[in-house]
Swiss-Prot record:
It catalyses: a very-long-chain acyl-CoA + malonyl-CoA + H(+) = a very-long-chain 3-oxoacyl-CoA + CO2 + CoA; hexadecanoyl-CoA + malonyl-CoA + H(+) = 3-oxooctadecanoyl-CoA + CO2 + CoA; (9Z)-hexadecenoyl-CoA + malonyl-CoA + H(+) = 3-oxo-(11Z)-octadecenoyl-CoA + CO2 + CoA; dodecanoyl-CoA + malonyl-CoA + H(+) = 3-oxotetradecanoyl-CoA + CO2 + CoA. The gene is ELOVL6. This is Very long chain fatty acid elongase 6. Catalyzes the first and rate-limiting reaction of the four reactions that constitute the long-chain fatty acids elongation cycle. This endoplasmic reticulum-bound enzymatic process allows the addition of 2 carbons to the chain of long- and very long-chain fatty acids (VLCFAs) per cycle. Condensing enzyme that elongates fatty acids with 12, 14 and 16 carbons with higher activity toward C16:0 acyl-CoAs. Catalyzes the synthesis of unsaturated C16 long chain fatty acids and, to a lesser extent, C18:0 and those with low desaturation degree. The lineage of its organism: Eukaryota, Metazoa, Chordata, Craniata, Vertebrata. It is found in: Endoplasmic reticulum membrane. Disulfide bonds: none annotated. It comes from the Eukaryota. It comes from Gallus gallus.
Length: 265
């Protein structure tokens, strides 16, 4: 196991965190993510059915608080993990930043790695607001939530290579995305270009994810990266499907609407 630990000032809760207990718990309980996913899917179909004949709920204030909470969490996660990844990348190179496993057990990053994985369960709550407010629920939304939850819990238990990249990227994108959601829910008018930027960031994240998987597979053949073929296959399928779905969403939401508007004019 390659170890490269960046010394950062730790908060007390980061010092007290026991990563060994966390990893053991996930090894014993990761399959519960399937139960959460099943309950989530049941809520989606059951909730939409119940709301068919009911008036929508506004829930503006709860939505602001929800989005703001996730934005703050993601910002802290990005601020605490990005310096680690940047340090490894600049001092040890790309290969070490991908293959290094100390992200899971390092003084600061260990807490945020586990917090990231656990956060994928409460993030399912995003959909509750969509259902109760009777907004359009697209396939990408719930498919993304379910698969990220399953893959995150499945991968954390094995401390697979590439995890530092995956988690840090997601923290960064979510920091911007949930901040945008909070502003919109609070009634602020935000430029359409900002929403386009977020989607482009997500598309870029998926491309980088595919590249990381390729690198892990290549270096794994030489015993330099800790992972296994099954994980890489699932991860690659997941990132490729995200890439296709987010590209389709970008075209439908921004390019397609603009083209239709011009034809009408």
């Amino acid at each position: 196991m390659n170890m490269s630990v960046l010394t950062l000032q730790e908060y007390e809760f980061e010092k007290q965190f026991n990563e060994h207990e966390a990893i053991q718990w996930m090894q014993e309980n990761w399959k519960k993510s399937f139960l959460f996913s099943a309950l989530y899917a049941a809520f989606i179909f059951g909730g939409r059915h119940l709301m068919n004949k009911r008036a929508k709920f506004e829930l503006r204030k709860p939505l602001v608080l929800w989005s703001l909470s996730l934005a703050v969490f993601s910002i802290f996660g990005a601020v605490r993990t990005a310096p680690y990844m940047l340090y490894i990348l600049m001092t040890k190179g790309l290969k070490q930043s991908v293959c290094d496993q100390s992200f899971y057990i390092g003084p600061v990053s260990k807490f945020w790695a586990y917090a990231f994985v656990l956060s994928k369960a409460p993030e399912l709550g995003d959909t509750i607001f969509i259902i109760l407010r009777k907004q359009k629920l697209i396939f990408l939304h719930w498919y993304h939530h379910i698969t990220v939850l399953l893959y995150s819990w499945y991968s954390y238990k094995d401390m697979v290579a590439g995890g530092g990249w995956f988690m840090t990227m997601n923290y960064g994108v979510h920091a911007v995305m949930y901040s945008y959601y909070a502003l919109r829910a609070a009634g602020f008018r935000v430029s359409r270009k900002f929403a386009m930027f977020i989607t482009l960031s997500q598309i870029t994240q998926m491309l980088v994810g595919c590249v990381i998987n390729y690198l892990v597979f290549s270096w794994m053949q030489h015993g330099q990266c800790h992972s296994h073929v099954q994980n890489i296959i699932w991860s690659s399928l997941m990132y490729l499907s995200y890439f296709v779905l987010f590209c389709h969403f970008f075209f439908e939401a921004y390019i397609g609407k603009t083209t239709k508007a011009r034809k009408v004019d």
